[in-house]
Amino acid sequence: MLPDWISLDCAAPSESHRQAAMARQAQLTKPLGALGRLEEVAVELAALQATDHPGADRAPVVLFAGDHGIAAQGVSAYPPEVTVQMLRNFAGGGAAIAVLARHLNCPLEVVDVGTLASDAVPGVVADKTRRGTRDFSVAQALTPEEVAFACDAGRRALARQADHQPQLVIFGEMGIGNTTSAAAIAAALLSCAPVDIVGSGTGLDADGRAKKAAVIVAALARHGLTSDAAVADILAAVGGFEIIAMAGAMIAAAQRRWPVLVDGFIVSVAALAAVRLNPSCRTWLLFSHRSAERGHALVLDALGAHPLIDLDLRLGEASGAATALPIIRLACALHNGMATFAEAAVSGRDA
């Protein structure tokens, strides 16, 4: 059973602020639409933040980590112990997202929601009920109670960001085997063939991708995940702690009226699950980039999402969202800082 709060409605964006932002864009010293997506981003944030001065300076990053029993089937190019090793790298500042967050002045919190770590990792918040999921090729990955716990862990992590007074939030993930879990979730939610979704993940070759797809096909059949399967059942059968925590965190963010800048394939699968669980959260999700992972385009299409950038990224860790953040900040700076035709004494189009 999922927590009751999961289904609580999320507020709608402010239409009055959207209209005001659109009117301001029409008055700025440029042809209307000349700044393309930058104008759209500023207008959308103004509506989401219910403000005349949208911004993205306060943008905490929360990275959720978990291990996956399915890694025992050889679906990753890296061994499971890498997850815990990377926890230390995140906390020590040497991982890509740590560098990006530091450069962007974004607070970074790393949360262990289900890794194999038996001891506390300095600088990492531990909020878990189990060390790793079960191998979903032979058993359910999670119990319903563990799914609910992961949702709540995501909400708790989100609540800890309140002191930062977020203008938007970013979620990332780490977990050896999690592209397999994400692909299985996406295949079940979208009723797609796994071969159309499975990508290279951490660097699999063609044979590795074929093996990963076959593992997912067998698992979906084993668990009876047909097109009418409930989202909660899909998450329990083939999900991961960090993926479910992100879905919960997204819904909780939307319920607080905090926009979410969504990262790549795995985070987008969490977003798809979140939207299926609570459709009213969709409007609070902004999409940062199109990943090189094969299945990402299908997930984005299902969400009606139009990401800002496409740099062939496939690292995860929220690295794509962090890379897109400066574009959002610039969009807000232009919206807030440009002069109107009247202020600059420049003749408008109809003059």
UniProtKB/Swiss-Prot annotation:
CDD domains tied to this protein: DMB-PRT_CobT
Domain of life, per lineage: Bacteria
Iron-sulfur is among the record's keywords: no
Pathway(s) where this gene product acts: Nucleoside biosynthesis; alpha-ribazole biosynthesis; alpha-ribazole from 5,6-dimethylbenzimidazole: step 1/2
GO MF annotations in UniProt: nicotinate-nucleotide-dimethylbenzimidazole phosphoribosyltransferase activity
Coiled coil regions in record: none
Family named by the database record: Belongs to the CobT family.
Task performed by this protein: Catalyzes the synthesis of alpha-ribazole-5'-phosphate from nicotinate mononucleotide (NAMN) and 5,6-dimethylbenzimidazole (DMB).
NCBIfam families, per the entry: cobT_DBIPRT (TIGR03160), PRK00105.1 (NF000996)
Name of the protein this chain belongs to: Nicotinate-nucleotide--dimethylbenzimidazole phosphoribosyltransferase
The species this protein was found in: Bradyrhizobium sp. (strain BTAi1 / ATCC BAA-1182)
